[in-house]
UniProtKB/Swiss-Prot annotation:
Organism whose genome encodes this protein: Pseudomonas putida (strain ATCC 47054 / DSM 6125 / CFBP 8728 / NCIMB 11950 / KT2440)
EC number of this enzyme: 7.5.2.7
Record GO terms (molecular function): ABC-type D-ribose transporter activity; ATP binding; ATP hydrolysis activity
Protein name: Ribose import ATP-binding protein RbsA
GO cellular component terms, semicolon-separated: plasma membrane
Amino acid sequence: MSTPVLELRGIVKTFGATRALDGASLRVAAGSVHGLVGENGAGKSTLIKVLAGIHRPDAGSLLLDGQPHGHFSPRQVERLGIGFIHQERLLPARFTVGEALFFGHERRFGPLLDRRSQQREAARLLDDYFGLRLPANALIGELSSAEQQMVQIVRALLIKPRVLVFDEPSVALVQREVERLLRIVQRLRDDGLAIVYISHYLQEIEALCDRVTVLRNGRDVAEVSPRNTSLEQITRLMVNREVGELYPKVAVPAGALLLDVRGLGRARAYQGIDLQVRRGEIVGLTGLVGSGAKELLRSLFGLAPPDSGEVRLDGQPLSLRSPREAVAQGVALMPEERRRQGVALDLSVQENTTLAALSRFVRLGLLSPARERHTTLELIERLRIKAHGAHAKVRQLSGGNQQKVALAKWFARCSSLYLLDEPSVGIDVGAKVEIYRLIGELVKEGAGVLILSSDLPELIGLCDRIHVMHRGAIAARFAAGEANSDRLLAVATGAQRAQNEERPFYAYAIAI
């Protein structure tokens, strides 16, 4: 690499007795996308806060174009041409698009704020950069997550940065929005910017990055090229263990039949679904978008009631007319959209944990905060939730800990059937292992688990059986030990037929 535009060299940062960064380094070239990956606690956030001027390092240096710079304030960072796209949308909800774009860089006509000029320029910039036609007087709070992010990117580009840092930019986006984001990043790279891209989604890292720095325990342990390094190798560098160790296999003999689905159908979604889950069993479900797998899981929780067929739970008919009825009969759902549907971000850990089981904490007609707190503290310890007590806001927790809180509320209710929709999406590898451990605890206690996942290695590593849906039907079934990525992908592409089916099935694999 020629002289990098940006270099962080030997950065050390301690907080009390905790050494968050232990000589970490990062080198980023112009016209490249440089990935930064690592488990929670590896030091990614601290390193970026040092770069942003929020934290003063105890040792180490920052160089721009090979020239050393001392510690600087966030405002000075901006003047040096370093911009940031943060995971959390930081633009005030009551600002207009024009106000948000030019906040801190307001346009004036004499002593007066020139709002009209700002609004015209804001609309032009959004259209020029992204073809996004938003009214400049639209409120930020009325925009989608993707639209807010576009505003944030344009705002960062107004300082004419040479370095742009994307911190978990795709967390709140749906797939088509992620694809647009990746195209934008590629365009910025082609324009000559040096991009730092931080993500738990290693598929994005593989597709986008020219180089990747791996952090572990506050140190940069490797800098690799995704073209020459597999995602499994990157994962191994992150966690310092073999990929096979990520999936703790739980030796639990299958128990009595828990969920029995016969001939289930829903118009324009799926038909003729037969599916069984026994107590102590983990069953996998996968399929392309539109295959019917997502709709099937929603139906089993009463969100999209089926039109035909029969579902029994513990031998009794299961009513699927509403989520309320499903929950009352022992069904739990952990949705993919964790931040929107799985937890209430502005409520505390305690309020989230007890939300689905409030009747357990009522005495003499009144809610008992003491009993709520006792149960919450037990679950915080059992699920190893990292939070500053039961009253910490869920918004303040990492993605992995938010996922644990989403699961904790069903632990509190002692549900018998757990429907897990993409349970490890958007969390780092270490947090995934914790979620897998908790899934193992559920089956040890006699629950049944149905996992919908697009991560084939995850399904292969965890499940006793895997069902694959295609065009609204279960097209293939695999027992544990029968499936591997090569075989699944061969069948998925139509190159090979499943031995136990007359037609091919289709699935897609997303590595760890």
